[in-house]
Amino acid sequence: MSIKAEEISALIKQQLESYQDEISVEETGTVTYVGDGVARAHGLNNALQGELLLFDNGVYGMVQNLEASDVGIVILGDFTGITEGDTVKRTGRIMEVPVGDQLIGRVVNPLGQAIDGKGDISTDKTRPIEHKAPGVMDRQGVSEPLQTGIKAIDALVPIGRGQRELIIGDRKTGKSSIAIDTIINQKDQDMICIYVAIGQKASTVRAQVSTLEKFGAMDYTIVVTASPSEPAPMLYIAPYAGAAMGEEFMHNGKHVLIVYDDLTKQADAYRELSLILRRAPGREAYPGDIFYTHSRLLERAAKLNDELGGGSMTALPVIETKAGDVSAYIPTNVISITDGQIFLNSDSFYSGVRPAMDAGTSVSRVGGDAQIKAMKKVAGTLRLDLSAYKELESFAQFGSDLDAATQARLARGERTVEVLKQGLHESVPVAKEVIILFALTHGHLDKLEVADVLRYQNELFDYMDASHKDLEDSITTTGNLPEGNTLEDAIKEFDGMFQPTAKADDTAAQTAD
């Protein structure tokens, strides 16, 4: 068998043509320090702020500090397997989390990994956790109401889609309960909810998820949780991960409600990281950019203009105060960033007024724009009535003789406080809120005993459902009060049937005789 030189030459040329240079160049560094959720590495001269790095043991880190000789890295996972001298390499990409419909109904960690035991999440969509907030021209005014189902909030501090409304108060005053009840009330409202639990005990998160499942709210909710046992970097990135998941829906024209519960713990985690990375401490030992940490997060909530799809993301950040001190550093920062605050008073809470909202210090900077017209009409004087009542109540304690007008205002105030009370997970549809507030402001409750007010409310709701469902439907569909005196006549009709407790007791006694 003879081998021709031409054939050998052709084979060599063919091999050369198909040859690919598969040499990959990776920039690597050496770990010089590791501990408390952070590491330092030398040799990563071209690393970028916020870039993901990969350690030898498969754990990722994120560049936080860029210094002359090394980089400071926050470790996104278990740092116990990383030792001094290990290799760390650049990935060339920034931190991303999975997004999309597949996450709805799931409980995930800040990396987007499922932790609810229901299997992996199959989605190939991701978004960076850090994203520039929509600009001024990309937004439109907040005008669409977000109904919380809580009478005191919908009447006094209304929230609109695209707004940032702070929930602030001492521990154990019902902050999380308001957020959870608001999520529950979004059923059938074309809203996707995201609950970000930052630094909350696993048992607490489990209880919250069980509550959401009980009311069918997990059908439209994503829960992102970073427990206290996890490294501080996980608590720090949790709200940004939740915001990225929400932005995916917002930019597709959908409406999102996101709860950050709570940002005090995120600030504490960021302070811990910054001090370990030897950043200069400022007021209360927080780093100088703690304001920017929260502002760049909360500014991502917006109502996009119609050209961008008209989607919205409404944020309810939660802040915990110490002894009601809203003038501390973090509370004042977040108050100045948000569009209003719901302040919960511990004294009111322990005296049985729940939700324990302080009408004097709570405010919504969007105001009546986020209310339906019917609610605006019936709740217009409510705040003034409450303020006057609080002022007169303290004056009346001195035992002075009061004229009839003052006594009438005190009586109206007592009944207003009673009407605004609401049990846990007892959401009220907006039409029913309008009906009971209409009855209150038109004097139908003035002659009732305070103890009868909530019974009157519940029986009125039942009566309207049974006999005047058309009036409720009219308020729901049009957003206006029914024409003419139809609502007034219906409530008067019910007044004639309602039996106050004293009369009911007398009737029962006569029947027994």
From Swiss-Prot:
Topological category with respect to the lipid bilayer: Peripheral membrane protein
Taxonomic source organism: Levilactobacillus brevis (strain ATCC 367 / BCRC 12310 / CIP 105137 / JCM 1170 / LMG 11437 / NCIMB 947 / NCTC 947) (Lactobacillus brevis)
Keywords: ATP synthesis, ATP-binding, Cell membrane, CF(1), Hydrogen ion transport, Ion transport, Membrane, Nucleotide-binding, Translocase, Transport
UniProt function note: Produces ATP from ADP in the presence of a proton gradient across the membrane. The alpha chain is a regulatory subunit.
Subcellular location: Cell membrane
Chief location of this protein within or outside the cell: membrane
GO molecular function, one term: ATP binding
Reactions the enzyme catalyzes: ATP + H2O + 4 H(+)(in) = ADP + phosphate + 5 H(+)(out)
Subunit structure: F-type ATPases have 2 components, CF(1) - the catalytic core - and CF(0) - the membrane proton channel. CF(1) has five subunits: alpha(3), beta(3), gamma(1), delta(1), epsilon(1). CF(0) has three main subunits: a(1), b(2) and c(9-12). The alpha and beta chains form an alternating ring which encloses part of the gamma chain. CF(1) is attached to CF(0) by a central stalk formed by the gamma and epsilon chains, while a peripheral stalk is formed by the delta and b chains.
Site (Required for activity): S362
Signal peptide (UniProt feature, chain positions): none
Enzyme class: translocase
Enzyme Commission numbers on file: 7.1.2.2
Binding site for ATP: G169, D170, R171, K172, T173, G174, K175, S176
NCBIfam families attached to this UniProt entry: atpA, PRK13343.1
Gene3D superfamilies: 2.40.30.20, ATP synthase alpha/beta chain, C-terminal domain, P-loop containing nucleotide triphosphate hydrolases
Protein name (database record): ATP synthase subunit alpha
Sequence similarity: Belongs to the ATPase alpha/beta chains family.
GO CC terms, sorted: plasma membrane; proton-transporting ATP synthase complex
